[in-house]
Amino acid sequence: MQRYWQNSSRQRRTAARQICGNDATPSETNMQIIQSKKELRKGIKKARSDGKTIGFVPTMGFLHRGHLSLMRRARKENDLVVVSIFVNPTQFGPNEDLDAYPRDAQRDIALMTAESVDIAFFPAVEALYPEGYTTFVEVEGPMTEVLCGQSRPTHFRGVTTIVAKLFNMVAPDRAYFGQKDAQQAAVIRRMAVDLDFDLSIVVCPIVREADGLAMSSRNTYLSPEQRENAPQLNQALIMSREMVEKGERSGPAIRKAIESKINGAKGAVIDYVAVVNAETLAELQTLEGKVLIALAVKFGTTRLIDNIQIDVRHQLA
């Protein structure tokens, strides 16, 4: 992978500005690019001995502004920021997009440099899943069986396994995740509590394109026509919020309205629309408390997810 890292200062600035805008000013600090677990642990041990707090942002790379918002939050709240770039094979099912998932290490390094990341961790698959590997971490029960778990039954086992491994290696004070992957964040929070990880899970707001489409590395798969229709997912969620603000409290009614809206989008095929408790992910017939309205929709072979969280008081709005 070394050839991807031999980029000039000008290349780093150009790549960063394409994502961040012209106000991006990549620093010339010594961001460490680490591949080995041994070197990572060495860097973490040094930071701990110096009394530094550690913020961690786990990603699969091909970074976008959503990822960068997590890095900025981590930079603001911690002395040392670690970002991992690893396309985790165990969270992909058969016939999913593991091989096609976008990768660009040079571009990612430019963006991390611009955000003053201290350590960029690029482990090899063989380092994290060596021959003979047989151990997995799994949150059991309805939380991982609903929503994305219905159509991706092994997905969250792969997510919790790799995140647990990374937590053990990085030992962060805080780990940062995006609200777009709301179910993932809830599952990881459950795992962290159950396994007594001494850290805080920080969930940051969804970052959207100008037309409302939630930022995702998979957006690059969309054809021009699909990209034109994809913002209707967010429009359907905004409509659902407006329904709640006007007093609607029926989960099925909100779900049907969203499905009707999305079915009007050319090429959209609904995987699920769900109205659930934001913490337990249990389906709600009547809205109360913290509510998550989530959806997954396919445009061709591209599967997009989005959600909105609403704090519904017992009294009518």
PLM features: what roles do these ranges have?
Residues 8-9, 27:
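Serine residues within intrinsically disordered or low-complexity segments
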Residues 14-16, 24-25, 29:
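Ala/Thr-enriched low-complexity intrinsically disordered regions
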Residues 257-317:
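Phosphate/ribose-recognition catalytic cores of enzymes acting on nucleotide-derived substrates
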Residues 10, 54-55, 296-297:
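Short hydrophobic "helix-edge" motifs at membrane interfaces and signal-peptide entry regions
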